[in-house]
């Protein structure tokens, strides 16, 4: 009888040790996704969510989603760690500092961040960053905007001015100038990625100033701008961002500058789960060449001839015949060289 009890006890210990929280050796790995804002932004955060959902379809994982805000980043990350996450994804540049802090405090945890803003400081070995050459896709849509504008005036509507949005802005402006050196470009920022009404207000003013095409990179503010274009109707057009946003206003969204953060997330997470390896301590950069940034083909708005021009430009960018600017300094250099 004592031997039977001992065997039962030993089996219980083995079961508990094997079913412990979160490691790739356990039956169901746990992947967490933390964002600033909401998942239903129809843009950046939603793209990340779609990417990790595809991972969930392919692998048997437990998915934990967390909507956060700046005053609770660290405590929310601590909660995800305590919940047994194997890999924690942080979505957006606002997590840049806390990602490093969390990684240094928890060397046994694995972290990955989308769009970090890091200098040349070393990155912890248990942290990896995904960056994007969004300017390459924006160059193509800027070219399209300049070619299609009837008024000769186009606009850019940004959320918060900074390195990430600058890549879209200056890529877009460079592409437009490459297509038409005389094109007039107006740029406005609303100071937020979560203010739909501000986006509506600024877009309304821009359209009233005879701007007929706006490229947005403003989160929910951009959704507001799309609403305005749809309400104003014919002659008021917009370029979406991150994902194909044509479904929001099929007659007004010409194209979208795609920055498929979901694809980048999917590629890295799938490889991590397949190989049980983690290549941390570095940044991984994606652009046109990797098929992660680009533009949406829309034969309803973009002619076959114009599409061929865009494909030619894409090849030049991939082959480094054109180096697309991502900030003011490189933009001014680009203008001197090409315009």
Curated annotation (Swiss-Prot):
Phenotype upon changing residue 278 to S: In strain: 297
Compartment annotation:
Cell inner membrane
Asked whether the UniProt record includes Magnesium among its keywords, one would answer: no
Q: Could you tell me which residues are lipidated, with the kind given as S-diacylglycerol cysteine?
A: 18
Gene Ontology cellular-component terms listed:
membrane; plasma membrane
Task: Name the InterPro entries for this protein.
Answer: BMP_lipoprotein, Peripla_BP_I, PnrA-like
- The signal peptide here is 1-17
Sorted alphabetically, which keywords does the UniProt record give? Cell inner membrane, Cell membrane, Lipoprotein, Membrane, Palmitate, Signal, Transport
Q: Per the similarity annotation, which family is this?
A: Belongs to the BMP lipoprotein family.
Q: What is the annotated quaternary arrangement, including any partners?
A: Monomer.
Protein name as catalogued: Basic membrane protein A
What organism does the UniProt record list as the source? Answer: Borreliella burgdorferi (strain ATCC 35210 / DSM 4680 / CIP 102532 / B31)
